[in-house]
Swiss-Prot record:
Role played: May be involved in lipid homeostasis.
GO biological process, one term: protein secretion
Keyword Cytoplasm: yes
Disorder: Metabolic crises, recurrent, with rhabdomyolysis, cardiac arrhythmias, and neurodegeneration: An autosomal recessive disorder characterized by metabolic encephalomyopathic crises, hypoglycemia, hyperammonemia, episodic rhabdomyolysis, susceptibility to life-threatening cardiac tachyarrhythmias, developmental delay, intellectual disability, and mild diffuse cerebral atrophy.
Phenotype when changing R26K: In MECRCN; uncertain significance
Listed InterPro entries: TANGO2 (IPR008551)
Pfam families hit by this protein: TANGO2 (PF05742)
Family named by the database record: Belongs to the Tango2 family.
Protein name, per record: Transport and Golgi organization protein 2 homolog
Gene Ontology terms: cellular component: cytoplasm; cytosol; Golgi apparatus; mitochondrion
UniProt KW keywords: Cytoplasm, Disease variant, Golgi apparatus, Mitochondrion, Neurodegeneration
Cellular localisation: Cytoplasm; Mitochondrion; Golgi apparatus
């Protein structure tokens, strides 16, 4: 289970406003090996964490490049998985390394969507000169990707804006933090968004999660139904905040669990300006 909240306004009126505010949780088995967010050794334009699971090495769930390409992935909750399907993390990696625009890329992905287990993919081209474009495709929804209009969105392990109770609850908390964003110092805004991502209040009952997840989700429903998931050996292990201001200055903050220890976390921040 993962969750993403984001607000984008390609041309904010105020100089103090942000073009993009994104807050995301990665929920995964604590034992699954991965690298913390960093610029890639073989491509120092791209910043992301990396999956190091055998056979899935190099995939990722969220990343951004200095050229303004951004992508984020969530899995679609389904009771049965096809273990022969392609690894979904490659969808983000491929976009970050290609020169293809976000909509064209998602159109190509949509032609191959049947080769993967369920997923949702956000792809964006952030350009100070041309204006920002953010697109969405889910392979369990409509056949064609869509270009998103400016606004605030929530995405978990169903289709975009599916009203799971935890998504609605978290989105409201996110909106409250975002509404104060212009008046807050950047570090205070980041701290407020991290508080949103670490809210463990279960939003029950939620028939929508039960219906979609079936028997698979029943034993863990009370844990899955919170923005921040806490189960034995599985749960929220990475929080990521991405801010892009009116001038194209990016602040990328990642807070990650270390050594499978809930009491041990590391926070790292990267800042750069998008290539126009």
């Amino acid at each position: 289970m993962c969750i993403i909240f984001f607000k984008f306004d390609p041309r904010p009126v105020s100089k103090n406003a942000y073009r993009l505010i994104l807050a995301a949780n990665r929920d995964e088995f604590y034992s699954r090996p991965s690298k913390l967010a960093d610029f890639w050794g073989n491509n120092n334009e791209i910043l992301s964490g990396l999956d190091m699971e055998e056979g899935k090495e190099g995939g990722t769930w969220l990343g951004i490049s200095t050229r303004g390409k951004l992508a984020a992935l969530t899995n679609y909750l389904q009771p049965q998985l096809d273990w022969q399907a392609r690894g979904r993390g490659e969808l983000v990696t491929h976009f970050l390394t290609t020169d293809v625009d976000s909509l064209s890329y998602l159109k190509k992905v949509s032609m191959e969507g049947h080769l993967y287990n369920g997923f949702n993919l956000i792809a964006a081209d952030l350009s100070t000169a041309k204006g920002d474009v953010i697109c969405y495709y889910g392979n369990r929804g409509e056949p064609d990707p869509i270009v998103l209009t400016p606004g605030t969105y929530g995405l978990s392990n169903a289709l975009l804006e599916t009203p799971w109770r935890k998504l609605c609850f978290g989105k409201q908390l996110f909106l409250e933090a975002v509404e104060r964003s212009q008046a807050l110092p950047k570090d205070v805004l980041i701290a407020s968004l991290l508080d949103v991502l670490n809210n463990e209040e279960a939003q029950l009952p939620d028939p929508a999660i039960e219906d979609q997840g079936g028997e698979y989700v029943q034993p863990m429903l009370s844990k899955y139904a919170a923005v921040c998931v806490r189960c034995p050996g599985y749960g929220t292990r990475t929080n990521t905040i991405i801010l892009v201001d009116a001038d194209g200055h990016v602040t990328f903050t990642e807070r990650s669990m270390m050594d499978k220890d809930l009491s041990h976390w590391e926070t790292r921040t990267y800042e750069f300006t998008l290539q126009s």
